[in-house]
Amino acid sequence: MSKIHVRKKDTVVVISGKDKGKIGEVLSVLPKKGKVIVKDVNVVTKHQKPNRENMQGGIIHKEAPIFSSKVMLYCDKCKSATRISNKILEDGTKVRVCKKCGETF
């Protein structure tokens, strides 16, 4: 269980698997499992039984978690997947920086 390099609301690109090349926003991070849930990536169909919240039931589509090692942060300036480095500014704040172009996240 290592530290996850992406955070909630980051834009990421999938680098391997059936959804390779898809770009999406991180909906949630599961650090104990080492997984992330990305919008419109790894969508599975679930057969839901009727219950109090969902009286109708039926087939629903929802995103399933994928391993965090399969995603990379997406830089809007570079328009590509990139690695990040941490940089400390003069005022002492810590920011994440794109290794390709130097853009801050």
Curated annotation (Swiss-Prot):
Q: Domain of life of the organism in this record? A: Bacteria
Xref: InterPro entries: KOW, Rib_uL2_dom2, Ribosomal_uL24, Ribosomal_uL24_KOW, Translation_prot_SH3-like_sf
List keywords of the entry alphabetically. Answer: Ribonucleoprotein, Ribosomal protein, RNA-binding, rRNA-binding
Gene Ontology MF terms: rRNA binding; structural constituent of ribosome
Q: Does the keyword Oxidoreductase apply?
A: no
UniProt-listed GO biological process terms = translation
- Looking at the keywords, is Metal-binding present? no
Which Pfam families does this one have? KOW, ribosomal_L24
> Quick one: a GO cellular component term?
ribosome
Fetch the CDD domains from UniProt.
KOW_RPL26 (cd06089)
| SMART domains the record matches | KOW
Function recorded in the entry: One of two assembly initiator proteins, it binds directly to the 5'-end of the 23S rRNA, where it nucleates assembly of the 50S subunit. One of the proteins that surrounds the polypeptide exit tunnel on the outside of the subunit.
Q: How does it assemble?
A: Part of the 50S ribosomal subunit.
Family listed: Belongs to the universal ribosomal protein uL24 family.
Name of the protein:
Large ribosomal subunit protein uL24
Protein source organism: Clostridium botulinum (strain Langeland / NCTC 10281 / Type F)
Name the lineage.
Bacteria, Bacillati, Bacillota, Clostridia, Eubacteriales
Point out the gene that encodes the protein. rplX
